[in-house]
A protein has these predicted regions:
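A structural motif corresponding to the C-terminal end of an alpha-helix
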Residues: 4-18, 48-68
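Terminal and linker regions of secretory-pathway proteins
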Residues: 129, 145-165
Length: 165
């Protein structure tokens, strides 16, 4: 990834480049389930994310790139969800059973990409009572629209702090 940023983005003249790490996979609903079954495997998920961050930062040392710590942003939001308008940070908003029905059984794992499986009918795969704006996770690993908004709000603050906006 750092090689791509150096060789394909910076080398071609990009002036405003920000790199994000990945949030801690163990902090997601699926990661929490893995931790409950096997703390060793759950810890490996965190190590994976930390290693990615290390390699990415190391590969960009000395480059004109601003670093955005998505892992820290997610940790902050998950530590005080109400401050960010979230009412649920443990259960995915998308309902795997509904998505399986909507896709004719083609999608059975609840992957958020298919939460809106019916064209023209937004978010038809939501769990009863779920709100994609106040439930942080869409599926076991990915943020909901509200989760991504929280991330983008924090990224925007950092871009302003960099003087880019």
């Amino acid at each position: 990834m750092s090689g791509y940023i150096r060789n394909e983005i910076l080398a071609k003249g990009a002036k405003y480049v920000a790199a994000l790490n990945i949030p801690d996979p163990a902090a997601t609903p699926e990661g929490a389930a893995v931790m409950a079954m096997s703390p060793v495997v759950g810890a490996a998920l965190t190590t994976f994310a930390d290693t990615f961050k290390l390699w990415l930062r190391e590969g960009l040392t000395g480059q004109p790139v601003q670093w955005i710590d998505a892992k820290a942003i997610f940790a902050t939001v998950l530590a005080d969800p109400a401050a960010y308008g979230f009412t649920n940070i443990t259960v995915p908003a998308c309902d795997a059973e509904k998505m399986a029905l909507l896709t004719g059984g083609l999608v059975t794992d609840g992957f958020a990409l298919f939460c809106n499986a019916t064209p023209g009918s937004p978010l038809t795969g939501l769990r009863v009572g779920a709100d994609a704006d106040t439930w942080f996770f869409a599926d076991g690993n990915h943020p909901s629209t509200g989760g991504f908004k929280a991330l983008s709000d924090e990224v925007l603050k950092q871009l302003k702090a960099f003087g880019w906006i």
